[in-house]
Structure formats: C-alpha cells, structure tokens
C-alpha cells in the first residue's frame, strides 16, 4: 500500500542526478522482502548562511509501506531515518499522497507530528469521466481558450521548456515567494522516461504549462503556471492543468494527483479553489513533520516569514 513513484529506485536515481539535492533512502526488510521504504532529498537555498538555516529533508508522497508491515518495522524505519538525517537537516517533512491514518500513532511515538494538508485526486479512468466531473466554469474556460486560438501540447524541445521555466521563475519570485528548483531539474526531468512537460501556446508565444511525473498508474502535477490576463477569453493556467489531466486519461493512468492544495485555516487559498473546479476528490492526508533541531527550526521559520514580507 501507499506506493507512489516518489518512493521508487527510479526516483532515488533521479534525485541523485541533481547537483543541488542530497538524496537519501532507507529500507526495513523482513528477510529479503522490503516492508517499508523512505526516499527523499535534502534541499538548501541560497548562499552558505541561508543554506545553513534552510536545510530540510523532504519525503514526497510519504513512505512506501506494505499491507502487512508491522508497527515495529515502521518504528525501526522512522528511527533510522531521523537518526541518519540528524545533523544534516533541521527538519523532515513527509508530504503524504495516501492515507496514513492507521500509522499516525507510530509516527507520533517516534517524534513526528501531524499537520493537516489538502490535496486533490482526479479520476482519469477515462476521458468521459474527466469531462463529466469538470466544473462548468472550467469547461467554459477551456472552450473559449481553444476557440480563440490557444493550444496545448507536449513540449517539443528544451527551448520550449526553458520558456516555461522563465514563467515559473517569475511566478515564484513575485507571488509564491519560495525558491524554485534550478533549471537543471527541468532539463533532466524533460530528458527522463518519467517526465511529461506540457506547454500552452497563444499568439505565437508560450504562455503557460505544467510539469508532470508519470508513475505506474498516476500522473503527478509537480509545477503548473500560466500568464493570466493576456486575454479576457484565454486561460493559460486552466489549459496547462487540463493538458496533464487529458494526457493521463488518454494514456491509461487512473489518477491525476495535484500534489497539494493548502491547509485548513490558510485563508481560503485561491489555488485550492482553482484546483477544485477540475472535479477531483478533496482529500486530507496531511503531512508528518519531525523537527531535528528546534532552535534552528524556529529561527529559520521566523526568517522565512520576514523575507516573504520584505519581497
């Protein structure tokens, strides 16, 4: 259970190919059989001082756990993870894509805390199901965008991916105000067997797109963006996400995972409202966090908040 592309050896190898990440992998076995696996990366931002205060370990998707994993096996896996990463990262965050409710007490016993966090799972078993579940406003936005000349397709070359990256970079600098992966990530993902990058064209320019990863039966939307306001009837962000959803439905994937939609009490979170209209199921599988260095964690959290206000 709880398996996803981010907990595979292929993902670990991909992380290992990136110069700006420090990958890690831990396993617990019963005999020769793996019963649990944690794959993730340590990320740092900026210069030496900022890197020191921004060291965090990210586990995308949450641990891979078999149906019959025991409490002792999971406890052993979590303890090995925290022991090995102590001193390397300030905190560890598991961003769950599946339901870990029955394991929550074990996580908490090992020093992890649970934080509510939303996500959307879209049923892409068929294009008919996708179309039936789309909200009326999304259908209208897609229809008018295509009618007035916008198109979407898989990126044909790295030059197109670079144009998309420039839009993402501007978005993260001005609105998201958190660090974006460097160009190396997008270049290598595009050239990998798992990456699918779609771009939106309008009036001869790339005006948006989405960056996806394809797992066994799920397409994951890692990044998405669009230059809104370029036309009253063209909606690049909507077309970008729909491109990934349509690809999933037409190529045998049963789910499109939006990889996060904010948390309760975040003031409405416009991105969640945007994602909701694609007709997916709102799930709350949350995140587990283990703070390895409380003092540095609180200093880092305060500093990030102040920097966002100053930008």
Each language-model region and where it sits:
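Active-site/acyl-donor-binding loops of N-acyltransferases
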Residues: 38-46, 105-129, 253-311
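Short, flexible, mixed-charge acidic loops at enzyme active sites
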Residues: 48-56
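Short catalytic-loop micro-motif centered on adjacent basic/acidic residues
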Residues: 91-94, 153, 257-259
